Amino acid sequence: MIARIWSGESPLWRLLLPLSWLYGLVSGGIRLCYRLGIKRAWRAPVPVVVVGNLTAGGNGKTPVVIWLVEQLQQRGIRVGVVSRGYGGKAASYPLLLTPQTSSAEAGDEPVLIYQRTGAPVAVSPVRSDAVKAILARHDVQIIVTDDGLQHYRLARDIEIVVIDGVRRFGNGWWLPAGPMRERASRLKSVDAVIVNGGVARPGEIPMQLAPGLAVNLCTGERRHVAELSNIVAMAGIGHPPRFFATLEACGASLQKCVPLADHQSLAFNDVKALVTDGQTLVMTEKDAVKCRGFAEDNWWYLPVDARLSGEQPDALLEQLISLAR
C-alpha cells in the first residue's frame, strides 16, 4: 500500500498532504537554521563524506558505502565509518564495533560494513559522538557516514546522494504522502549523484548492483544461485522486490518470495518456518548478519557489490584522496 501511495498510483496520498506540508516545513526549517548559523554544526578534524538519500526506502546506499571504503583502502587511505545504527539498541553510545558486536546492538548495516571492510565503525544517534569515538582509538584520515544527509549537526566536506533509478522520487511529495525527506532540488547542492539501476541522467553516476556467488551461512560454501533448488527468497531491506528480481536475473527459480520490513528483527523459529524439507532459503547479506548465529545448512545469502561506471567515479575518488591527504 505504501509503495502505491508513494508512486502516485493510489489517490490516498492526497489525504496525507497536511502532514507532508508539516514535515517539509520542519525539515526545511532545520536545514535553514544551520545554513544561517542559528544552529552550529560540529566539524571533525578530518574530512567527512556523507552518503545518503533524499527518499525513504532502500536505494542501495550501503553497497555504495562499502564500495567507497574499499576503493579508498586500496589507495592507502585509512577510513572510518559512522552510522546512526538503525534497528540496533546498544547499552550505551557511542558504540565502537568489535568482532563480537551483534546487529541487535549496532544495527545490521554497520555490522555488515564492519565485516566486509574491516574499517573502524562506530554508531550513535549523535553522529559527532561516533566520529569522536573512532578518532580516539584509530588514526583515520577520512570519515564516511552511512546515511545522515539530513543530520546537519555533523558538518560535512562531501555529500553523495544515492537514488533508485527506477523509482526515483515517486510522487515527489514529502513524507508521509510521498517518499521525500527533502526536495529534489537538494540535488543541486550535493557533490555527486549515484543512480542505482534505471537510466542515469546527465551528470549522474550510473551504478548497478552486481551479485556474487551465493554463500552458505553454515559452511561458507559458494555456489551459483541458479544451482540451488526449490528456493524461498527472503529480504528484509528497504525495497525487497529489487532483491527478488536480482535472484531471477541470476537464473534462480523462486518458489516463494518473503518480503520483510527493513531492520526487522529475526528469530530462529520465524525464519525456519519459512522453508520446509527440501527447500532452500536464500536471503540478503544484510539479513545473513542477523541469522548467522542460528543458521541451518540449507540457508544461503547472495552478496552484491556496487559497480559504478564512467569516468566520474575516478574523479570522485581523486577528490576524496586529495582531501584525506
From Swiss-Prot:
Enzyme Commission (EC) number: 2.7.1.130
Cited function: Transfers the gamma-phosphate of ATP to the 4'-position of a tetraacyldisaccharide 1-phosphate intermediate (termed DS-1-P) to form tetraacyldisaccharide 1,4'-bis-phosphate (lipid IVA).
Keyword Lipid metabolism found: yes
GO MF assignments: ATP binding; tetraacyldisaccharide 4'-kinase activity
Gene designation per UniProt: lpxK
Family according to the record: Belongs to the LpxK family.
UniProt: ATP binding residues: T55, A56, G57, G58, N59, G60, K61, T62
Keywords for this protein: ATP-binding, Kinase, Lipid A biosynthesis, Lipid biosynthesis, Lipid metabolism, Nucleotide-binding, Transferase
Lineage per the UniProt record: Bacteria, Pseudomonadati, Pseudomonadota, Gammaproteobacteria, Enterobacterales
A GO cellular-component term linked to this record: plasma membrane
GO process terms (BP): lipid A biosynthetic process; lipopolysaccharide core region biosynthetic process
Alphabetical list of InterPro entries matching this protein: LpxK (IPR003758), P-loop_NTPase (IPR027417)
Entry annotated with the keyword Lipid biosynthesis: yes
Alphabetized Pfam families for the sequence: LpxK (PF02606)
Pathway: Glycolipid biosynthesis; lipid IV(A) biosynthesis; lipid IV(A) from (3R)-3-hydroxytetradecanoyl-[acyl-carrier-protein] and UDP-N-acetyl-alpha-D-glucosamine: step 6/6
Organism for this UniProt entry: Citrobacter koseri (strain ATCC BAA-895 / CDC 4225-83 / SGSC4696)
Enzyme class: transferase
Catalytic activity: a lipid A disaccharide + ATP = a lipid IVA + ADP + H(+)
Name the UniProt record assigns to this protein: Tetraacyldisaccharide 4'-kinase
